[in-house]
């Protein structure tokens, strides 16, 4: 099924290692013969130097948003695995559900490049996506139940009983549907792209509500955000009440604004599950970071205010 362009997203530079390795100048050998072992060591040192000399350059890449299609299965599933890591969540089923309800949601792809460009572009490669799964409507599906069990289990481990009861009631109140908001992208895609993606999703949700389509009605949004904090600081139960927003860093910078408006929020560590191949290395300026997941619940009536805040900070 061909994807149709939905909305042009923000073009921006992302960091990519480019350029050929630097050439190391060889010193003239004073002796005619060199031991084999010494030659091997020199070769090894040369390879290390070449790796060190690779430089990062900023490449300007234009992105565009497309409606979700069958070709996006692998890319969406990979990004969901980046979010849930080793958690017992059926990401294959979740991906299929998101694709079935393609009246909402978008994927981010690179804008078509000219034929004379030297860049090799995979037209089906996605750099991110946004969508929503109505957990109340999808009650009984394996992935929806697993996600609810996941957040409740970590809430029990890290929060006071009153918050556990509040979250349990919220997730199981069928009269007030809860939507799982999913906004995932690779770590080097700039946050400015989030503004048109979220704006488009809100329009699609409003249209779904007007036409009585799935996902249209949500009273609350559940968001599981990739965050991290300086290693050594705790996200335990005692720490949750005093955990300041400033101590958290958000992989998706715009999700800090959702955090500010959340009526319920807590974090848990995924230190033993992190995969640097997908999410990048969790360190800044050589300061080790502990990868977390931050769960937050935002009422629907606060979403317009969040969208205005995103517009103020992310408009280009």
Curated annotation (Swiss-Prot):
Residues 163-261 are annotated as: Interaction with CDKN1A. Residues 25-57 have a biased composition (Acidic residues). The modification Phosphoserine is found at residues 44, 114, 283. GO terms for cellular component: centriole; centrosome; cytosol; mitotic spindle pole; nuclear cyclin-dependent protein kinase holoenzyme complex; nucleoplasm. Signal peptide: none annotated. GO terms for molecular function: kinase regulator activity. Keywords: Cell cycle, Cytoplasm, Cytoskeleton, DNA damage, DNA repair, Nucleus, Phosphoprotein. It is found in: Nucleus; Cytoplasm, Cytoskeleton, Microtubule organizing center, Centrosome, Centriole; Cytoplasm, Cytoskeleton, Spindle pole. InterPro entries: BCP1_family. Residues 61-169 are annotated as: Interaction with BRCA2. It comes from the Eukaryota. Its main location: nucleus. One of its GO terms (biological process) is mitotic spindle assembly. Residues 1-57 are annotated as: Disordered. Expressed in the testes (at protein level). During interphase, required for microtubule organizing and anchoring activities. During mitosis, required for the organization and stabilization of the spindle pole. May promote cell cycle arrest by enhancing the inhibition of CDK2 activity by CDKN1A. May be required for repair of DNA damage by homologous recombination in conjunction with BRCA2. May not be involved in non-homologous end joining (NHEJ). Interacts with BRCA2, CDKN1A and MTDH/LYRIC. Interacts with DCTN1/p150-glued and ACTR1A/ARP1. Interacts with alpha-, beta- and gamma-tubulins. Interacts with TENT5C; the interaction has no effect on TENT5C poly(A) polymerase function. Belongs to the BCP1 family. PANTHER family: BRCA2 AND CDKN1A INTERACTING PROTEIN, BRCA2 AND CDKN1A-INTERACTING PROTEIN. This is BRCA2 and CDKN1A-interacting protein. It comes from Mus musculus.
């Amino acid at each position: 099924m061909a994807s149709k362009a939905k909305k042009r997203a923000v073009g921006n530079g992302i960091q990519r290692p480019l350029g050929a390795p630097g050439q190391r100048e060889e010193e003239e050998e004073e002796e005619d013969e060199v031991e084999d072992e010494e030659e091997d060591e020199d070769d090894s040192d040369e390879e290390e130097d070449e790796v060190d000399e690779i430089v990062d350059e900023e490449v300007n890449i234009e992105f565009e948003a497309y409606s979700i299609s069958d070709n996006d299965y692998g890319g969406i599933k990979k990004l969901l695995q980046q979010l849930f890591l080793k958690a017992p969540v059926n990401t294959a089923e979740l991906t299929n559900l998101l694709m079935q309800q393609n009246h909402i949601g978008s994927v981010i792809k690179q804008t078509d490049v000219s034929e004379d460009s030297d860049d090799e572009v995979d037209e089906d490669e996605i750099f991110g996506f946004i969508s929503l799964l109505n957990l109340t409507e999808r009650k009984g599906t394996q992935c929806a139940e697993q996600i609810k069990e996941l957040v409740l289990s970590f809430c029990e481990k890290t929060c006071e009983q009153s918050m556990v009861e509040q979250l349990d009631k919220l997730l199981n109140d069928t009269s007030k549907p809860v939507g799982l908001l999913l906004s995932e992208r690779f770590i080097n895609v700039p946050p400015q792209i989030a503004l048109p993606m979220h704006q488009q999703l809100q329009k699609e949700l409003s249209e779904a509500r007007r036409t009585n389509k799935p996902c249209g009605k949500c009273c609350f949004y559940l968001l599981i955000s990739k965050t991290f904090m300086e290693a050594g600081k705790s996200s335990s139960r005692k720490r949750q009440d005093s955990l300041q927003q400033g101590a958290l860093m958000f992989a998706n910078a715009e999700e800090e604004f959702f955090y500010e408006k959340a009526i319920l929020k807590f974090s848990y560590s995924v230190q033993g599950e992190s995969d640097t191949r997908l999410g990048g290395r969790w360190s800044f300026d050589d300061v080790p970071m502990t990868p977390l997941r931050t769960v937050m619940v935002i009422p629907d009536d606060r979403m317009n205010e969040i969208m205005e805040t995103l517009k103020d900070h992310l408009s280009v």
